Structures are given as structure tokens and as C-alpha cells.
Curated annotation (Swiss-Prot):
Catalytic site positions: 130 (proton donor), 133 (cysteine sulfenic acid (-soh) intermediate)
Keywords for this protein: Antioxidant, Disulfide bond, Oxidoreductase, Peroxidase, Redox-active center
Keyword Hydrolase among record annotations: no
Gene field: ahpD
Protein name, per record: Alkyl hydroperoxide reductase AhpD
Annotated catalysed reactions: N(6)-[(R)-dihydrolipoyl]-L-lysyl-[lipoyl-carrier protein] + a hydroperoxide = N(6)-[(R)-lipoyl]-L-lysyl-[lipoyl-carrier protein] + an alcohol + H2O
Cross-referenced InterPro entries: AhpD, AhpD-like, AhpD_core, CMD-like
Transmembrane segments: none
Pfam families: CMD
Disulfide feature: 130-133
Family: Belongs to the AhpD family.
HAMAP family: AhpD
Length: 178
């Protein structure tokens, strides 16, 4: 199970995604933990079984157990937070004075370098489409001294994984419908 299997699963019309997936795994802008944590958290955020299985297997070979669990934790807590904060954002500030009341302890104590965890939360928030969370995590990353190039590379990784997941679902759906 691997990125190579995902590339092979992509249909011809998704050739750009295949090339981008190959390129992102060779990035020099992200260190290994940043890259594979971003890929794993993004794969979890897509809710695509095949993408998560393939990325998860390769990430398990690369990441420490702590980083592996933290990346999945980022995807989980952001699934909750992205819905909450995106939903509250639709309400024109009428609920901004109320306490969220949601447990999110992993954000304060992720078990890995805080900036890496924030990077994974940023990537997942982009996939889940929460502008407030994307902006908040980007601000935290910049305050921590993370470069714009590193942040953009994580965004690219999230975009590629999201596109791969969609292309695979589209291909599988059309194959079973025809």
C-alpha cells in the first residue's frame, strides 16, 4: 500500500493529479514529519477509504507513533471545529460572544511539535472549507516563524490529496454505474 498504488488508481483524465502527487512526496519545503503528517491528516479529511488506507500505510512507516496519532487527531478535532466555526461564521457575529464549549485538548497538547500540528490543522481546515480556521491556523504558524513557502506547500499537499480522493471516487462510481 502506497502513494504508488494511488497513482496507479487514478484515471487518465487525472494525469495532473498523478504528477502532482509524485512531486509533493519529493518536496524539500516540508520535513518528513510535516509532509507525512499533512498527507495523513488530509487523507483522513477526505473520508476516502482507499486514499486513507494507502497514505496511512506509508505514513505509518515514516512517522513516529506520536506523530501518526497527532495527525489523525488533527483531522478529527478539525472535523468538529471546522463545522462549528464555519457555521458560526454564517451567523454574522450574533454568537461570537458565546463560549464554544467544545473539548479540544489535543490542540494544546498534541504530542508533537506544536507548529507541525498547526500545519496539519491548517491543511484539514482548507479541505473542510472553514475560512476562519484556515486564517487562524495560518496566523499561528506565521507567529511561530513558519515560512509562507512551508505553509503554501502544506496547502498544496492538502489540495492534491483532496483532488486524488475526488478523482478516485468519480472513477469508481462511473465504473460501477456503467
Amino acid at each position: 500500500m502506497s502513494v504508488e498504488n494511488l497513482k496507479e488508481a487514478l484515471p487518465e483524465y487525472a494525469k495532473d493529479l498523478k504528477l502532482n502527487l509524485g512531486s509533493i512526496t519529493r518536496t524539500t519545503e516540508l520535513n518528513e514529519e510535516q509532509l507525512w503528517g499533512t498527507l495523513l491528516a488530509s487523507a483522513a479529511a477526505t473520508r476516502n477509504t482507499q486514499v486513507l488506507t494507502e497514505i496511512g500505510a506509508e505514513a505509518a512507516d515514516t512517522l513516529s507513533a506520536e506523530a501518526y496519532h497527532a495527525a489523525l487527531g488533527a483531522a478529527s478535532v478539525m472535523a468538529m471545529n471546522n463545522v462549528f466555526y464555519r457555521g458560526r461564521g454564517f451567523l454574522d457575529g450574533k454568537y461570537d460572544d458565546l463560549r464554544a464549549g467544545l473539548r479540544m485538548n489535543i490542540i494544546g497538547n498534541p504530542g508533537v511539535e506544536k507548529a507541525n500540528f498547526e500545519l496539519w490543522c491548517f491543511a484539514v481546515s482548507a479541505i473542510n472549507g472553514c475560512p476562519d480556521c484556515v486564517a487562524s491556523h495560518e496566523h499561528t504558524l506565521r507567529e511561530a516563524g513558519v515560512s509562507r513557502e512551508t505553509i503554501q506547500e502544506a496547502l498544496k499537499a492538502a489540495a492534491i490529496i483532496s483532488g486524488v480522493a475526488q478523482a478516485i471516487v468519480t472513477s469508481q462510481t462511473l465504473a460501477t454505474a456503467g
